[in-house]
């Protein structure tokens, strides 16, 4: 519990610094948010009257902090927290996240109360992810002799580094990154505690999963967590690769029929989520909508990504997007170094499924998606944070210095990014 209290203290300190920066960021480059602020002026006045604080203090908090979180995608989220869907593309806009906030019976009918509820839930999820990462690190590396003596410190440092994640202010705003990461880390943790590492990867093993029934349940729950994470952010579909990996290990290498079926059921939950989300939009729009309804695989998600956001192979590779590639470059470099570190320098076989997912994410971001979002969406995977933490606990002065410089960069990036976000400047 002592380590958890340390994590909480660092978390509160860092969030406080972020909010101070937001408060003192002078003006917004894009003033379109003022239209929303003016539209919900009465909602703001209602909040001011409900708070038991002097008016000037309450108004200062709302005007200088909360108003500055009405930027970029938070504009869409905050609208959906309160209002019904108006446009087609909103159906694929992190559908489960905004529905969760909308369904919570707090602040109903008030724009500002729902916005602040979204921010509160986002920060709770961020803290929860830090704590899960602490226990996940213990579980993932406890069988590795390379980390036995420093496992507690390694786990704590990994969680602290996650607090200063390059995702930064997006884990504080009412974005979907924090809840997505929470359920993603939970899924990896539940999967990891379910696997019998004493026998795993041995060809003649009779046990792929631990024998007690509770571990069969936790393994199935790991698939449930991925399904929820996918409903929050589509990129979590990549986590399904873990269960395909397990199917290979359980069925082909270990020849365990029972646990092979469990891997199919656990991973199959993600498939059910995909079918359900696509069927829902198809039932609403098709066949009258035409266009994407007539595709071989009718998917509003795929259509919206390509039609509204120009997502596609090499679509983002242009001179105008060079700055966006530069924004993502540190995350790309750290991810590639993580692969090298955990395959060559400190090989940990348990990490292979996570590295596969991370590799797929990297390829997708660089070649298909808006590459700058890699900085924030990569927060649903722990590999990069483990790499920096591993450097930190190393006996090598060079490695330790590298880790220190990386953390300094993360802190500096967070401070700059927070100010840019509050000023409605890229990257988004």
UniProtKB/Swiss-Prot annotation:
Its main location: endoplasmic reticulum. It is an enzyme of class 2 (transferase). GO terms for molecular function: alpha-1,6-mannosyltransferase activity; glycolipid mannosyltransferase activity. One of its GO terms (biological process) is GPI anchor biosynthetic process. Keywords: Endoplasmic reticulum, Glycosyltransferase, GPI-anchor biosynthesis, Membrane, Transferase, Transmembrane, Transmembrane helix. It is found in: Endoplasmic reticulum membrane. It is a multi-pass membrane protein. InterPro entries: PIG-V/Gpi18. GO terms for cellular component: endoplasmic reticulum membrane; glycosylphosphatidylinositol-mannosyltransferase II complex. Pathway: Glycolipid biosynthesis; glycosylphosphatidylinositol-anchor biosynthesis. Its EC number is 2.4.1.-. It comes from the Eukaryota. The chain crosses the membrane at residues 4-24, 115-135, 154-174, 225-245, 265-285, 316-336, 351-371, 373-393, 407-427. Belongs to the PIGV family. PANTHER family: GPI MANNOSYLTRANSFERASE 2. Mannosyltransferase involved in glycosylphosphatidylinositol-anchor biosynthesis. Transfers the second mannose to the glycosylphosphatidylinositol during GPI precursor assembly. This is GPI mannosyltransferase 2. It comes from Debaryomyces hansenii (strain ATCC 36239 / CBS 767 / BCRC 21394 / JCM 1990 / NBRC 0083 / IGC 2968). The gene is GPI18.
């Amino acid at each position: 519990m002592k380590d958890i209290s340390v994590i909480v203290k660092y978390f509160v300190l860092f969030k406080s610094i972020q909010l101070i920066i937001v408060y003192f960021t002078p003006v917004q480059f894009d003033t379109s948010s003022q239209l929303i602020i003016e539209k919900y002026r009465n909602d703001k006045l209602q909040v001011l009257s409900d708070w038991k604080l002097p008016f000037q203090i309450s108004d200062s908090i709302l005007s200088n902090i909360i108003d500055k979180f009405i930027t970029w995608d938070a504009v869409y989220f905050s609208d959906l927290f309160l209002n019904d869907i108006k446009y087609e593309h909103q159906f694929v806009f992190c559908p489960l996240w905004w529905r969760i906030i909308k369904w919570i019976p707090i602040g109903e009918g008030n724009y500002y109360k729902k916005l602040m509820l979204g921010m509160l839930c986002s920060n709770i999820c961020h803290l929860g992810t830090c704590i899960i990462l602490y226990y996940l690190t213990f579980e993932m590396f406890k069988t590795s002799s390379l980390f036995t003596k420093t496992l507690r410190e390694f786990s704590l440092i990994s969680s602290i580094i996650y607090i200063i994640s390059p995702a930064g202010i997006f884990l504080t705003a009412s974005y979907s990154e924090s809840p997505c990461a929470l359920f993603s880390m939970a899924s990896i943790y539940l999967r990891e505690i379910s696997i019998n590492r004493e026998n795993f990867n041995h060809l003649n093993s009779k046990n792929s999963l631990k024998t007690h029934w509770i571990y069969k349940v936790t393994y199935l729950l790991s698939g449930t967590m991925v399904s929820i994470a996918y409903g929050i952010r589509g990129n979590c579909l990549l986590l399904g690769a873990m269960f395909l990996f397990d199917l290979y290990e359980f069925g082909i290498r270990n020849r365990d029929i029972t646990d092979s079926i469990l891997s199919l059921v656990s991973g199959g939950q993600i498939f059910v989520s995909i079918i359900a989300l696509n069927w829902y939009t198809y039932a609403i729009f098709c066949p009258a909508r035409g266009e994407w309804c007539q595709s071989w695989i009718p998917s509003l998600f795929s259509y919206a990504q390509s039609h509204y956001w120009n997502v596609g192979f090499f679509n983002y590779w242009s001179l105008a997007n060079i700055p966006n590639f530069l924004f993502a470059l540190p995350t790309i470099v750290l991810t590639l170094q993580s692969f090298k570190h955990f395959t060559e320098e400190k090989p940990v076989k348990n990490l292979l499924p996570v590295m596969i997912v991370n590799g797929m994410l990297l390829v997708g971001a660089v070649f298909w998606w808006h590459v700058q979002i890699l900085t924030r969406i990569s927060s649903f995977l722990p590999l990069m944070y483990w790499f920096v933490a591993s450097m930190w606990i190393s006996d090598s002065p060079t490695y330790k210095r590298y880790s220190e410089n990386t953390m300094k960069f993360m802190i500096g990036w967070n401070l700059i990014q927070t100010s840019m976000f509050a000023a409605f400047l890229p990257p988004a």
